[in-house]
Amino acid sequence: MEKNYYALAYYYFGPVSNPYEEIALHKQLFKTMDVSCRIYISEEGINGQFSGYQPDAERYMAWLKQRPDFASIKFKIHHIEENIFPRVTVKYRKELVALGCSVDTTKQGKHISPEEWHEKLQENRCLVLDVRNNYEWKIGHFENAVLPDIETFREFPDYADRLAKEHDPAKTPVMMYCTGGIRCELYSALLLEKGFKEVYQLDGGVIAYGLKMGTGKWRGKLFVFDDRMAMPIDEADPNVSPIARCSLCNTDSDTYYNCANTDCNNLFICCESCIATHKGCCSEECSQAPRIRAFSAERGNKPFRRKHLCPTIEQSCCLKEQENQPA
């Protein structure tokens, strides 16, 4: 019998009295469930991405909302066909979002609903700022958004300084967005510290916008840090036209792969034809390399984990598994 699964995205910024106890309780609960996840908990809150068999996911949501520290948490839910993380990971992380500097999160931009966001986009009055990494917005973003060429979130504090020099903070209203909302909690506070007076953030991020408004003013797909790699923001509109191009032949494509050359492992966009021709590699040079993972079109573009590296040799070349940057 076919099983239905949920993908959950959620976070909460607020004091957590005993994060290690919460971690232990999570792990104990998950022992009896058909789930996979990547959850970080600290004294400042929780940042979670979760997948699970529907009854188990519903049980977990009800359980978490009964925890005193997490009663106000909001879940964003998508229907999926299987678990989308390699394992259950619940761990302590002091910085829920790796910004690299401290900010006063008690002072944040104004949260606006997906409906309000959609209306403001049509006013064309604000600077619309994408605060995700460049490889994320490359396959999807809002119309007319400013797309910083940033590889990691730790580069955004320097970008904020540049933004304050290029635009008058007192006169430039800013609307910012990220995948699920958590990065905006920090970056909106940072822009306020830089002197920006009118700062808005999309409540629940792009995920919430898609659930409420459909495709709307969004173009392309949404990059996600799980086995799907990318997803349409509207479940009812899965056939989204690519806005990116294959890095090898320049045809339209929005599919990311990790290079099958284990000494490269580069994340790149590729079409079906080129990925087959180059055996899962990002270049002709890599396709001739000595340590190549076996490529299978049936496996699709799921990210490679440690267990997939160098199946015929000692796993001395294991590369660091890409850690999820909070949404």
Curated annotation (Swiss-Prot):
Ranges for domain Rhodanese: 122-218
SMART domains on file: RHOD (SM00450)
CDD domains, per database record: RHOD_YceA
Name of a matching Pfam family: Rhodanese_C
Gene3D superfamilies found in the cross-reference section: 3.30.70.100, Rhodanese-like domain
Keyword set, alphabetical order: Oxidoreductase, tRNA processing
MF terms (GO), sorted A to Z: oxidoreductase activity, acting on paired donors, with incorporation or reduction of molecular oxygen
Alphabetized InterPro entries for the sequence: Rhodanese-like_dom, Rhodanese-like_dom_sf, Rhodanese_C, TrhO, TRHO_N
Enzyme class: oxidoreductase
EC number: 1.14.-.-
Keyword Oxidoreductase in record: yes
Active site (catalytic residues): C178 (cysteine persulfide intermediate)
Coiled-coil segments on the chain, per record: none
Protein name: tRNA uridine(34) hydroxylase
Organism of derivation: Chlamydia trachomatis serovar L2 (strain ATCC VR-902B / DSM 19102 / 434/Bu)
